[in-house]
């Protein structure tokens, strides 16, 4: 059925993402786990149909999938495997999110949760995840597979590179920074006042480098 969707990744966020899918008028047809340990079980009433390998060995052409895992590198690889086999990974935007008509959001795998705001001339790349109440200000670009935790605020004119992690309630201040590097991690509640290089963790107010990753 065209409005059926299958969720990949079973865990504590399964019901949250199932509700997002349903809010976007999809019917959750089942779940797939990374291995066979839970095949045949249910999670919050949804059947666990098999492992990722089971899925890859089946006919998935034209079917819809939602990727719920938190590890963005794994998500990126799974996405490639699904698309290569004809799977579809639609972008899902909660109906009460506020999206500027001038924003540019990838049609592949973006998840925009309730009460988010994406302002004019912002760009959101493939596979990005915006948890509830994230704000992305104007003229900011999220490259592919960026994760923004609940209530993260991303100011204007900032470029955030692939697989960066913007922690819950963190603030990236407009006019103070130009970029956040690839795979950088912004700690929860951090206030970012200068550019962040790739592959580091920053935390605190003002945010400073804690360690490399």
What are these regions (language model features)?
Residues 2-21:
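Glycine-rich adenosine-cofactor-binding loop
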Residues 12, 73-74, 105:
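Short alpha-helical
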Residues 18-20, 77-81, 124, 197-198:
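Short amphipathic alpha-helical segments
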Residues 37-98:
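Phosphate-bearing ligand-interacting subdomains
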Residues 24-28:
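A generic structural motif
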Residues 92-203, 207-210:
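Structural signal for interior beta-strand "rungs" in well-ordered beta-sheet cores
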Residues 3, 63, 182:
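Nucleotide donor/acceptor-binding cores
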